[in-house]
Curated annotation (Swiss-Prot):
Belongs to the peptidase T1A family. GO terms for cellular component: cytosol; nucleoplasm; nucleus; proteasome core complex, alpha-subunit complex; spermatoproteasome complex. It is found in: Nucleus. Keywords: Differentiation, Nucleus, Proteasome, Spermatogenesis. CDD domains: proteasome_alpha_type_7. Pfam families: Proteasome, Proteasome_A_N. The gene is Psma8. Its main location: nucleus. Component of the spermatoproteasome, a proteasome specifically found in testis that promotes acetylation-dependent degradation of histones, thereby participating actively to the exchange of histones during spermatogenesis. The proteasome is a protein complex that degrades unneeded or damaged proteins by proteolysis, a chemical reaction that breaks peptide bonds. Required for 20S core proteasome assembly, essential for the degradation of meiotic proteins RAD51 and RPA1 at late prophase I and the progression of meiosis I during spermatogenesis. This is Proteasome subunit alpha type-8. It comes from Mus musculus. GO terms for biological process: cell differentiation; meiotic cell cycle; proteasomal protein catabolic process; regulation of meiosis I; spermatogenesis; ubiquitin-dependent protein catabolic process. Component of the outer alpha-ring of the 20S proteasome core which is composed of 28 subunits that are arranged in four stacked rings, resulting in a barrel-shaped structure. The catalytic chamber with the active sites is on the inside of the barrel. Interacts with canonical subunits of the spermatoproteasome, including proteasome activators PSME4 (also called PA200) and PSME3 (also called PA28-gamma). Disruption phenotype: Knockout mice were obtained according to the expected Mendelian ratios and showed no obvious phenotypes with respect to viability and development; however males show infertility. PSMA8-null spermatocytes exhibit delayed M-phase entry and are finally arrested at this stage, resulting in male infertility.
Length: 250
């Protein structure tokens, strides 16, 4: 039955489904896991990094990028689709700044991206974008923001969220571990993001891409060495906690 309705983007199935949009959401579920955490004075983005070929330049396969000085984005899904969305969003950021002489708010650029995605769900000769995005940054009020969009064009604000292949596992971890204490300072928020990714990344820090953004500061990408140091500290704390637990039990 589905095959009669899954070819045209603009045709609903009898039970109310847009199959092409659902297929785009499946493409997202096959993408690298990405996590976003909104701290008190910081927003952290982390992405599961796939291993690259020995001769490939790692800088060309990043899943985290800046849209403007105060807004950045991580995505899961089709990289080529993301490139188009990122390019459109960057142009809109600059156009808005030239027109009204103020930078975009994080919600404004999120709504722009969501609207762009929605248009591609009801236009002939196009297909939906196969990406979900975590869009983060700071507005003039200094409050950190985190939004998530999906291929259907919806968007929501979050305290913490995950997208991609293992989003369900990471989200469950965040629901258990995201507390005010866990984001009380910048370092704890960074650790929480890494811990969440370590739930699904098997080979430790070398397969994690991490970035932070603070108020009035540009996006900061962590080097592989910095990530390894954070992972080592997390593992050391975990070992100490287990030793303390075993002593109490005896």
């Amino acid at each position: 039955m589905a095959s009669r309705y899954d070819r045209a983007i603009t045709v609903f199935s009898p039970d109310g489904h847009l199959f092409q949009v659902e297929y785009a959401q499946e493409a997202v579920k096959k993408g690298s896991t990405a996590v976003g955490i909104r701290g008190t004075n910081i927003v952290v983005l982390g992405v599961e990094k796939k291993s690259v070929a020995k001769l490939q330049d790692e800088r060309t396969v990043r899943k985290i990028c800046a849209l403007d000085d105060h807004v950045c984005m991580a995505f899961a899904g089709l990289t080529a689709d993301a490139r188009v969305v990122i390019s459109r969003a960057r142009v809109e950021c600059q156009s808005h700044k030239l027109t009204v002489e103020d930078p975009v708010t994080v919600e404004y650029i999120t709504r722009f991206i969501a609207t762009l995605k929605q248009k591609y769900t009801q236009s002939n000769g196009r297909r939906p974008f196969g990406i979900s995005a975590l869009i983060v940054g700071f507005d003039d009020d200094g409050i950190p923001r985190l939004y998530q969009t999906d291929p259907s064009g919806t968007y929501h604000a979050w305290k913490a969220n995950a997208i991609g292949r293992s989003a369900k596992t990471v989200r469950e971890f965040l629901e258990k571990n995201y507390t005010e204490d866990a984001i009380s300072n910048d370092k704890e928020a960074i650790k929480l993001a890494i811990k969440a990714l370590l739930e699904v990344v098997q080979s430790g820090g070398k397969n994690i891409e991490l970035a932070i953004i603070r108020r009035d500061q540009p996006l900061k990408m962590f080097s592989a060495k910095e990530i390894e140091l954070e992972v080592s500290e997390i593992e050391r704390e975990k070992d100490e906690a287990e030793k303390t637990k075993s002593k109490k039990s005896t």
